Amino acid sequence: MKAILSSILLVAISSPAWAHTRLASSDPKAGTSIKSPSLIRLVFSETLEPAFSGATLSDAAGKTIPVSAAVGTTTITLMPLALKPGTYTVRWHSVGHDTHRVSGDLRFTVVP
């Protein structure tokens, strides 16, 4: 019995942690009102697979806003031009080393 428990413990300790990627933080934070941001930064809990991760920005009418974007090791950064006052939605998707796609969105409001 001791040998079986030891084997199980050894496998459990040596197995990699395959957690799904989740959004850990963002700037701006969801639901905030801010002046037009020069950067929108999403920080994730796990390393991203850049080829399969990204984000888009849209206005209250659902129109996609053109932005420059960069996917880093654990971040997605959007660089919009000056945003007019209104509500905006960032829709993101990420794939981590576990190969599971996770997605979500966050909204913020630009004020004059």
Predicted ranges, named:
Residues 6-7, 17:
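Cleavable N-terminal signal peptides
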Residues 19-35:
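N-terminal edge beta-strand
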Residues 35, 39-46, 99-112:
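Extended, polar beta-sheet/loop recognition surfaces of beta-rich domains
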Residues 40-65:
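Short, surface-exposed alpha-helix to beta-strand junction/turn motifs within ectodomains of secreted
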Residues 67-72:
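Short beta-strand segments within Ig-like beta-sandwich modules, predominantly Fibronectin type-III
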Residues 74-78:
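Short strand-edge motifs at loop-to-beta-strand transitions and within beta-strands
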Residues 84-93:
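A glycine-anchored, Pro-Gly-centered beta-turn/N-cap motif
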